[in-house]
Structures are given as C-alpha cells and as structure tokens.
Amino acid sequence: MASIDLASTPLTATQNVDPNEIKKFEDMASRWWDLEGEFKPLHQINPLRLNYVLEKANGLFGKRVLDVGCGGGILAESMAREGAQVTGLDMGKEPLEVARLHALETGTKLTYIQSTVEAHAEANPHTYDVVTCMEMLEHVPDPLSVIQSCAKLVKPGGHVFFSTLNRNVKSYLFAIVGAEKLLKIVPEGTHDHNKFIRPSELLKMVDHTALQEQGITGLHYNPFTDTYRLGSNVDVNYIVHTRLF
C-alpha cells in the first residue's frame, strides 16, 4: 500500500543535511517500530502530537499532508489512518525502507520520498493542506531554511506545525542528563544541546516567512509515571502551530 521514491539527488555539501545525523538514525532504523526500543518516546508522544494536529487543523480526512523528517513513519502513518493523503519526507534511506515495510504490513496507504525539504518545496509549491515538521529542526544545520521551505509547501489557509526542544539549563538537565545519561530513555548522543532552539528564536524564523503563529504548547514528561502530557510550560519540548494566510 505504501509507495517510496528513493531516486533523490545525491547527498552534497550544499544540502541542508548533517551526514552524521543521517547515519545516526540509519543505524537505529531497524528498531523504529520497537515500542520498547530507542524510539519509545516517539511512540509515547505520538497520540499527543496527532491529537494536537487534528484539533488545530480541524481534522485530516481527505487533506494532503506532508510530514517533513518522517523517519520510520510513526506520525505519518497515524495521520494516514485518519484519512489524510500523506507524503513522508526524509533523507535517510534506511528509515524510509522501514517506514514503507511497516505501512505494507499494516495496510496503510501513503507515499514516502527521499529528498530534502528544500528540493521538495521547489518542485511542489503550495501543495499541502497541512505540513508537520516534528523533532527535526534540531538535527539540521540550517533550521531557517527548513521553516522557509515548509512555508512554500503549504497552501494558503493551510497549517504548519513545528516541534523541537528549548535551549536552557532545564532542557539540558531533562533531555541530555536525564533522558540520555541517567534514565537511558534515548541513546546517548541523540541530541546536541547547542542545536536546541528557543521558542523566541523559532518564532523569529517564522517571522521571516509568510507564516503566522497561531499558538504554542509544551510537552511534558513525568518520569515517575513514564507518561507525557501537553501543557503551557515550554521549558523543554514544545510545538508551534502556524498558518499561511
């Protein structure tokens, strides 16, 4: 049911891609759908992310949706099951293969493409009703370029969602010391705190596009119950909702 286009342009130094980041996630790709593996946090937060998108975008049924930095397809597949026409975009070949195979196993219909968001935006301007870019901005050299490309890809009136990690002492303690070093929730080295993005910085980048911020919410982890919830505090993880008018 899933189709995949791996005929992308070769990886070059001019692309907005960090080869080390690509390799890191390719090495873990086979375990992407292991609910107790390295990507357990993504599986845990996915219902929250999905419900947030559904609420703000007034549902996804029949809409064209692009998931930028889709990896193994956790969010992309869940949006497709809501009736959306989903395209998942990533530069990692192995995660895309895993995503395609999982979609075949579950009978989920969607399309995966190996491409940078910049190249996809050039070829597909104002194509999508909804664009999601979750936990991806902190893994690329130039997050502004990604945000600008997302703005090009969405239709007028459409929605664009960004999620990333705040850069402060608390996020270092929670995301690096706690999650990676102590609790081992994610592999050590998954994140670079210097690449985290403050909400004020992300919103300034949004201001360089035609997108308009519609709201921001935090994503909170409770280590005692091993659960996540949405809330007003954006000290660590957060999601920004924007629209193109």
From Swiss-Prot:
Superkingdom of origin: Bacteria
Instruction: Write out the residues that bind S-adenosyl-L-methionine.
Output: R49, G69, D90, M134
State the UniProt keywords alphabetically.
Methyltransferase, S-adenosyl-L-methionine, Transferase, Ubiquinone biosynthesis
State any GO BP term from the record. Answer: methylation
What does the UniProt record say this protein does? O-methyltransferase that catalyzes the 2 O-methylation steps in the ubiquinone biosynthetic pathway.
Q: Which family does it belong to?
A: Belongs to the methyltransferase superfamily. UbiG/COQ3 family.
- The name under which this protein is listed is Ubiquinone biosynthesis O-methyltransferase
Q: Which organism is it from?
A: Vibrio cholerae serotype O1 (strain ATCC 39315 / El Tor Inaba N16961)
Q: What is the lineage of its organism?
A: Bacteria, Pseudomonadati, Pseudomonadota, Gammaproteobacteria, Vibrionales
- Which gene does this sequence derive from? ubiG
